[in-house]
């Protein structure tokens, strides 16, 4: 497998409409104003179209392994602040700019919770500043990638069997 193209910013969009499309439009515009090569993963797995806009490549979807490699190599990751997304970022040992989906109480809570941790930057959907995020991201605490722990996984499986 060839190595992934190193993108400066990897942005991953998810969430319910209309906020998914609103964020798509906001990030498409903002990413075109930032120097470098970027990728915007639009969260549309059934859309066959990849679009290039200058240094921005907009893709409908990426396989998990490819997305993880792009995220590991990016200067900045931009995503929603859903629980699963945050856990994926922690597992990769990566910080990110997180943008809670407006009206999604869990994401707004998680954004507030993580705002001061040194792991994530938080911006509101109506106030995105990628330039400021790039500067701030360079000062975030570096975290180790969480490695797989087969003994722990086996113990949890056994515990689940005993409880189930």
Residue ranges and their predicted role:
Residues 1-76:
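Donor-nucleotide binding loops and adjacent catalytic segments primarily
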Residues 18, 45-46, 83-85, 103-105, ...:
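Short Gly/Pro-enriched loop/turn and capping motifs at secondary-structure junctions
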Residues 21, 61-65, 83, 108, ...:
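Structural motif corresponding to alpha-helix initiation and N-cap regions
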Residues 23-25, 51-53, 89-92, 109-111:
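Short amphipathic alpha-helical segments
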Residues 32, 90, 115-116:
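Anion (oxyanion) recognition and catalysis
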Residues 66-109:
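A donor-sugar binding/catalytic signature common to diverse glycosyltransferases
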Residues 95-140:
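Nucleotide-sugar donor-binding patch of glycosyltransferase catalytic domains
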Residues 131-164:
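C-terminal amphipathic helix plus adjacent low-complexity
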């Amino acid at each position: 497998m060839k190595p992934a193209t190193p993108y400066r910013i990897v942005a991953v969009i998810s969430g319910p409409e209309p906020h998914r499309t609103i964020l798509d439009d906001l990030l498409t515009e903002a990413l075109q104003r930032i120097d470098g090569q970027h990728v915007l993963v639009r969260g549309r797995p059934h859309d066959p179209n990849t679009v290039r806009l200058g240094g921005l490549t907009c893709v409908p979807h990426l396989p998990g392994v490819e997305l993880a490699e792009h995220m590991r190599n990016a200067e900045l990751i931009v995503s929603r602040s859903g629980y699963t997304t945050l856990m994926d970022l922690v597992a990769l040992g990566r910080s990110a700019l997180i943008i809670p989906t407006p009206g999604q109480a869990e994401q707004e809570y998680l954004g507030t919770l993580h705002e001061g941790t040194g792991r994530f930057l938080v911006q509101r959907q109506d106030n995105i500043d990628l330039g400021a995020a790039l500067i701030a991201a360079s000062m975030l605490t570096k975290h180790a990638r969480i490695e797989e722990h087969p003994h722990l996984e086996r113990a949890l499986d056994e515990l689940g069997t005993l409880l189930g």
